[in-house]
Amino acid sequence: MLFSVFYLSLFLSVGLLSARRAVPDGSAAVIVPLGCGFGVSLLAVLPALFAVVLGFTPPAVALAAVAAAGIGASLLYRGTRLRGMAKDPDSGALWACLLPVVLITLYLLHTHVLHLVDGAYHTGQSCYGDMPMHLGFIKYIAQSGEFLPRYPLLGGTHRFGYPFLCETVSSVFVVLGADLRTAYLLPMLPAFLSVYGMFWQLARRVTDSVGKACLAFYLFFMGSGLGFVYFLGSADSFAGIFTGFYTTPTNFVEKNIEWVNPIVDLLIPQRATLFGWCVLLPAVYLLWRFCYEGERRLWPWLAALVLPLPLLHTHSALALVLLCLVGGVYTLAQGPRRKTLLPWLGLAAVCGAAWLCQMLPTVLAQSLDGQHMLRLHFNWINGQDDGTLRDNYFWFYIKNIGLVYLLLIPAFLRAKPKQRWLYGGGLAILALAEFVVFQPNNYDNNKLLYVWHILGCILA
């Protein structure tokens, strides 16, 4: 276990140096979560690169560490240091905002991931289906050494179209000798810090307000829906929140309440979502500064950060593409100039080449081979196969999202132009997700819809 902790610390240290180099004016409140995003990205990229040639084996893992150390040494040689960071008088507000949610998350990770009680492993409702799958993938990749992996559940006869880098970031620690629970949890800790910290930093940067950043943070992670109304009728109904199965104010299928809490129903059970957002939220923060604040020098750092995103979380990669497309239109609308367009071309070329190499033999191949992955469907889980809706379109989102949904139009009208453009990227995501399904289960389009919701919480 100690060796695994040291290995993770190496990648996180390089991630912090990368964040410091990318954003030299950043305070520790920016560098720490941004550095966690860079560190996890490197942990996904480097072992996979060597595993393509050597298999997912100890030599590949060792060479990845050497490469990470080399990157860190290069940054140090160029004068990058973690000391002397900018002072931020608002950093205390960040940590005060994050601390309660971080403590809740740590407790839930402890109780939901292979929690041994009286000789039996315990978990929670949200992890019943997802965690066994993830544990199987993590163990299989480490034990077989096969890379690119194939689905172990199907006897190795089908290509692995699932974004498997969210598993290799734990498989690497199994290869290093860690037990399965330790390997499962280790990379999740910096990933959560990146998600929480960079959500807050993005919200503050976009709104230029500490108070609005804190409000957006809790509106998103704690929820603003109206599902609680269904549990106010009697004491038994209210008690059912704690004792029933799929009877919570954010997950009550019987009443078409399915806008789940992102912490307990997305980030903890669904590793692809966690590690995808761990990279996506820092990326959107850099995109805001790159596109809407004119910091064109950031494009190589943005490209480096998101290199593994399609195989960490394909939905997050698609969401980022749409945000970049709208950002590119914004740049063109300001008057195209060579010095503003070249960085966009560089970003598109690097990400386009790297992402296609990853996706052609995996995600795209599975989407196009007749497995009903890509099809038309309207209104997410509210839409039925016969074309009808379970609830009125707007009422469905009003009762599921609540206050934030009701405030979107007035907030958009009062927003500054750059904020409207950023949210325009969210509207592009919403429009696509409401008409096209990208996987066999309609429900999983929420992985796109929640990115729209992130921007909606910041806007509102």
For each feature predicted by the language model, list its residue ranges.
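Active-site lumenal/periplasmic loops and adjacent helix-entry segments of GT-C-fold
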Residues: 102-279, 314
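Perimembrane helix-loop-helix junctions
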Residues: 287-297, 302, 306, 319-351
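Membrane-interface alpha helices of multi-pass inner-membrane proteins
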Residues: 264-267, 286, 299-314
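Hydrophobic, aromatic-rich transmembrane alpha-helices
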Residues: 282-290, 323-334, 399-420, 460
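Transmembrane alpha-helix segments characteristic
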Residues: 102, 297-308, 323, 344-350, ...
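Hydrophobic/aromatic-rich transmembrane helices and adjacent perimembrane loops
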Residues: 189-192, 273, 318-321, 441-460
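Membrane-embedded, hydrophobic transmembrane alpha-helices
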Residues: 1-91, 425
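Hydrophobic alpha-helical membrane-interfacial segments at the cytosolic entry of transmembrane helices
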Residues: 94-103, 215-219, 304, 336-362, ...
